[in-house]
Structures are given as C-alpha cells and as structure tokens.
C-alpha cells in the first residue's frame, strides 16, 4: 500500500482518484459511515480503490505517504504518530499543487468574502476568454482539477483557488518556494475570529492565512480590515483596496490606482463600470470590497479593463450569500426572503444586517462559534424588528439579547416554523404601517444565522437550500 487518504469528502474522493490515475495503490479511510459514504465507497471499489468506513483511523501497512482531507484536524493523534515514523503527510491541496505547479495561481483566503471574491475573479478570466478555474474550497476540489488537467479534459490558463485555513494549514510545500514557484497572486479578504475550535488561538489561525501572503509574488489586501492594516509593513509588492480612501495603490507603483467614485469603478483614471446594477444583485459595502479585491487581482494577472467590465455586468452573486430566494406581495408591501446561510459567525451576521435596510425580520441561531457577538447584537437592536432563534444556541442568544434590552425574540424548533412565523411577523408589520398611514416599504425576512449549521444540518448549503425551499413553497401556496 503506497498512499493512504484520510477522509472521504469530495476532496478525499478527488485525491484518491488522482493518485490512482498516476498508478499508485491507494487506501481511503473515513471514521464516519453514512449512505453517501457507502455510495462513494462502492464507486471507488469499482475503480480499484479499497475504502474502510466507520472505524477509527489506523495507519495501514506499507504506506509511504498520507494525504489528509481538509476536514481532518492536522494535529490528529494518528497524524502525529505518522510524522514520528518519518512518513510524509500532505494536505489534499498540496497534493494537487504537485500536478498543477506549472500553472499560475491566484490564491484567495480570508474569514469572510473569499468565495464571492474567488467567483468574481473567475468570472473576469472567463470574460477575457481565459480558463480561470474556480476551485479549492469552492467549486471543484483541487485534486479533481489536477486530474482533469492531466487527462486533457480541462485546459486551465490560471488556477483560481479559494484556500481555507484548513487547507493552508496542511499545505506547507504549496506555500514554500518549491520548483514552479509560489502562487502568483495572493488575496486576503478579511480577518476575524473563526474556527478557533479547530486552530486553538487567533494567532495560530492568522498564521495559516498569512502563509499565502508570505509566499505570493503579488498581494492584494483589504485596507479596511483592522487586523490586516496592523500588518501593513509585513509584505512588499502589495495592493491595498479601500472604499473610504479615494484609490487603491501599490506600494511599489503609486501610479497604479483603482477607485470608486459616484457608484462607478475607475482603473487608472478610466471609468470601467457603473455599479448600480451590481449593488442591487450583490448588496452591501462588503461586496464592493470583494469587487475591488477581484479587480485588483485581475489587473495583476494582466486582464484588460473590458473583461472586468463584462464580468461585473454578468455576475449574478453567490448562493447562500444575501441571495434573494422569494418575494411575496402583501397589499402594497413587498416581503423579500433573503438567504444568507453562509453567515456562520457573528462578523458575517453583522455584515449581512449592515448591507440591508430595515425593517428586517431575522432568523438566526445554530451551533455557536467562539467569538464576540457584541457588535452583531447591537446592530440587531438598531435595525431588526423581530428575531426568530433556532438551534442549539437559541437560549443563549435569547439571553444575550435580553441583556441589551431587546425583547422582540421568539424561539422556534425548526426552520420551517421560523419561515412561517417570520412571514406572519412581516404581515403584521405591514398592517401596522398601513394603519399608521406610513408609505409601503419592502420588508426583508433574512436567514443569517451567525452560527454553524451542524446542529441541524450537514452544511450551510443544506440549511440554505432548506430555507429556499420553505420560502418558495410558501410563495407558491399563496399564488394558488
């Protein structure tokens, strides 16, 4: 047995197939067991790859290298024992790098905003007539892209990789000066506390994110992020974006500018795009930050302004990120249902509320993460008409809201009930405004949990899809 892959998620599945296609013997091992994993087990067995499920990880006999899926903790006891035996341990992203290091990469990381930024960069490459494959923590697993490239099924010009802290933690060689060079462009969107249950400390979490920037040839950073600004002297060849300042400048080239004025994007003085439609599809200041980060990366990659313009016009936004999934007209009042299930921490929850105008009915809760909810709670008090809380964190969050004298709170058992109760609350607000003679204005029912999904769902996508289905079913029932 030459290679052992730990974890049978989509990344582990792709890694196993990549290794097998290169002629290696492969064993896949996952401690979990489920119908989905058994389906994948059957597929791999047919491809000559044995799979063990539902057993604690063990090192198989004769293994020369262990490949780790992003969901497996890098300090897992088995991995510590493997390293002590001198057996190499690599992450799935690093494995893919071995086969993709001949291509230029844009690597994008950050606590929030990285998926939208990655998708925007990929859209800009597409608009330029180039294949910039969005992959990694978004889209295709990196190993799947590597295999498809080796087989000639994909012919990427660039790799546009969203890289999570889990992937960067397990990618020391990817982030080092190996033959083929480091990622060409590194982008860091934001930094706030997250995943501390995995990484232990904020400093350790930051160190994994910083790996990408330390090794990139060019860097694009959010100049409005307090943590990143404190590290301004750490990196050369860096572009800093800002909505507050009139321009983006490169430390080495002050003439390279990118700025927003009067809802227009300018690059080196040329008006590239009107942003009113983009702001409607992708609301919030954070999405303008994402746009600036993507445009800066695109310019560093040599893309023309016309490609950036075309991508801005065509970009439809991302599922589960302030995604409008339904609208119900109640008299003169439109009630909009917005899916922000990707908001899995307090900072993301704050960003969503900050992007929308009141009145807002908020659905929140799930499995709480470490972090300070203070700013999020204060914005709820300022902008939210009613809060519906679900999941493990509901009692704790309700108590926290009571602590700041916010009392329009209801605990609900499921998302189905939350949608029904939120719609009832929105209708009540509409009737109240009508009685008071106030002009009709849109009411937003917002799912922005500010918590992880794993208490009730398999992923934030699962939770967001359920919300979308509930809202569209409600809309359909009222249209009949």
Swiss-Prot record:
Q: What is its EC number?
A: 6.3.2.9
Q: Which organism is it from?
A: Synechococcus sp. (strain JA-2-3B'a(2-13))
The protein's name is: UDP-N-acetylmuramoylalanine--D-glutamate ligase
List, alphabetically, the Gene3D superfamilies matched: Mur ligase, C-terminal domain (3.90.190.20), Mur-like, catalytic domain (3.40.1190.10), NAD(P)-binding Rossmann-like Domain (3.40.50.720)
Q: Which InterPro entries match?
A: Mur-like_cat_sf (IPR036565), Mur_ligase_C_dom_sf (IPR036615), Mur_ligase_cen (IPR013221), MurD (IPR005762)
Q: Which family does it belong to?
A: Belongs to the MurCDEF family.
Q: Which reaction does it catalyse?
A: UDP-N-acetyl-alpha-D-muramoyl-L-alanine + D-glutamate + ATP = UDP-N-acetyl-alpha-D-muramoyl-L-alanyl-D-glutamate + ADP + phosphate + H(+)
Function, as annotated = Cell wall formation. Catalyzes the addition of glutamate to the nucleotide precursor UDP-N-acetylmuramoyl-L-alanine (UMA).
The pathway that the record names for this protein is: Cell wall biogenesis; peptidoglycan biosynthesis
- Per UniProt, what is the name of the gene that codes for the protein in this document? murD
One GO term describing the cellular component: cytoplasm
Give the location in the cell.
Cytoplasm
